[in-house]
């Protein structure tokens, strides 16, 4: 949840209008709304490889395509979807960020079978209509905000992993101080001392 809040919240912070920031950021921070960033289409380490499209038609966008692995996608109320509005996959220009309510008709949300606790989902979009007012930042220029948000997300993910490892280490040390084998604390065994 933390990395999802940081990723999505950062995208809103970097690209959102003042109204979007004032409305959404307090809801995200308070936990009132759960939000997820949807940009991965299977090229996990290349965020410019976006091929999901959003064609502007009047005052709406028509969204089609899919997202392969969306962290916290199963529990999200709202998505920030990175889409191609111009150019070709691989270009940094032509990427836009759109806010999408999870209950919008035409969106399919499926659980993915990854061994992780992050509620990964696969999203499929079939002619999903999104109001033009749900554009984050400027049309075709969403990559700069996306890139900054991903940088913050990487730092957050590293902090989460470090915290988890520290907890495992602390519990292991505690166990070594409490568990006895052959009438002796196992923490006194030389082989286990080498590992801690």
Predicted features and spans:
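Glycine-rich beta->alpha junctions and the first turn(s) of the following alpha-helix
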Residues: 107-195
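Short Gly/Pro-enriched turn/cap motifs at secondary-structure boundaries
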Residues: 42-45, 69-72, 88-89, 112-119
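A short, Trp-centered hydrophobic/proline-enriched beta-strand micro-motif
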Residues: 31-42
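A short core secondary-structure module
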Residues: 64-108
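Internal helix-loop-helix
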Residues: 1-31, 71-78
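A structural signal for short hydrophobic beta-strand segments in well-ordered beta-sheet cores
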Residues: 52-55
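Buried hydrophobic positions in well-ordered alpha/beta secondary-structure cores of metabolic enzymes
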Residues: 17, 37, 63-65, 81, ...
